[in-house]
């Protein structure tokens, strides 16, 4: 895989476990690319993935009528008859 970089790249030195380095070398050989290119790809892919939405933690946490969102003013300010 040939990756063309339009933006500037920054040199970065990292420490990596030997077993991960070996696995990276095998995968780089298999894909006919460099270990550095694989690392750039993996990091970019990981950072592009959206994290979990914190609002999802609240789903199902509250008890009430099914249409509360339709009458939010009534719930917050009380019903005006």
Curated annotation (Swiss-Prot):
<protein>
    <recommendedName>
        <fullName>Antitoxin VapB20</fullName>
    </recommendedName>
</protein>
<keyword id="KW-0238">DNA-binding</keyword>
<comment type="function">
    <text>Antitoxin component of a type II toxin-antitoxin (TA) system. Neutralizes the toxic effect of cognate toxin VapC20.</text>
</comment>
<dbReference type="GO" id="GO:0006355">
    <property type="term" value="P:regulation of DNA-templated transcription"/>
</dbReference>
<dbReference type="GO" id="GO:0003677">
    <property type="term" value="F:DNA binding"/>
</dbReference>
<dbReference type="InterPro" id="IPR002145">
    <property type="entry name" value="CopG"/>
</dbReference>
<keyword id="KW-1277">Toxin-antitoxin system</keyword>
<dbReference type="Pfam" id="PF01402">
    <property type="entry name" value="RHH_1"/>
</dbReference>
